[in-house]
């Protein structure tokens, strides 16, 4: 390790350019074990002490440079041994260590950017539900919406080259190429999805980092052009596509792109366009005509094709009118509903009738997909009729009731923002009867007999959760105000969403 000591003692501002020595540090793998791998399983499986683990990792990296087949393909056996050790497991160790190392400079950049902008960290902004108040505020004034699914996979060589622009460490990315070589069709411009699936399952941390970096790079270009388009002008659409291709070939991309772009497309000038993304799905909405939305649509397609070499079909990006079509996002169907109202006004002896139309965001629960999910989990059949869950029949009564109540509360917690609660009540009804049938099956009784023995208090537990939350939030509020809040509530403590 003495030969790497000179790199590790560099100035803190320059250390992000030398990530390769971090791969040989013991604590990096300790972090990887905490986040991903189980250290107890490693010790049992590998049979080595922690003092010799670093030596084995160094040997594996050296062997990788000599032979490009340390990482096994999907058809190879997981039991093959390399110096008496599991190949796939060690490749996972190194990939986890690399992922932890390469995340360090981006974390430092994020912290410094927050400090420079004096942005106060708020956990409420991390909530998935925080996007829906934004929809309620902005979308009633917009006209068109487009569902955009970010295409993947991109050519991994393009991804590595882009990553090298942000982290200037050639040695680390030579190692990254060796990892990716066995998981993709290197001679093809479009990586087969089956290789991506294999890579994401065996190296989840590294895969998530690479995917998030790809999305970040795509959005940085999108935001840059969006900010430039508010005051610049151009008359030819062909220049944009040439600039994108030119932009991909320039070493100092952002600086050159900024200087060499004295004018941006005037027909992108749209101060009322909004962009929202969660994972691989994004929403693009505007208040202008479909002409502007189509320009953005074809711009995105050419951006993916010319810069990331990803093929995307224009027919898969649909532009719909918000007042006539719903868009599906984060488990809700949302659209802008027209709410007409009539007001009678009287001035002296004359009376007037004023008709007014208010636009309001309407969010509904996708009842059919939810019933399909419940049917797949054996809570009901495909028609939505509740059935017993025999897998849980061996558990105690308390555990069975607790499991059903937990699922019911989670669904109620997430879908309490629906404009119409009938679908939510139907889901809770299915879970309630499924719980009763499971208990009746366990005790070899009928549902009617079992309900008589339990009483009506058991059923109330499935419906009183909302009222308990409201009583905590609004302890002194009037019944009318509580009823108003009962219409739609967004919670800011939901940080992830299971599909």
UniProtKB/Swiss-Prot annotation:
InterPro entries: Domain_X (IPR024937), Maturase_MatK (IPR002866), Maturase_MatK_N (IPR024942). One of its GO terms (cellular component) is chloroplast. Its main location: plastid. It comes from the Eukaryota. The keyword RNA-binding applies. The keyword Chloroplast applies. It is found in: Plastid, Chloroplast. Keywords: Chloroplast, mRNA processing, Plastid, RNA-binding, tRNA processing. GO terms for molecular function: RNA binding. One of its GO terms (biological process) is RNA splicing. Usually encoded in the trnK tRNA gene intron. Probably assists in splicing its own and other chloroplast group II introns. Belongs to the intron maturase 2 family. MatK subfamily. This is Maturase K. The gene is matK.
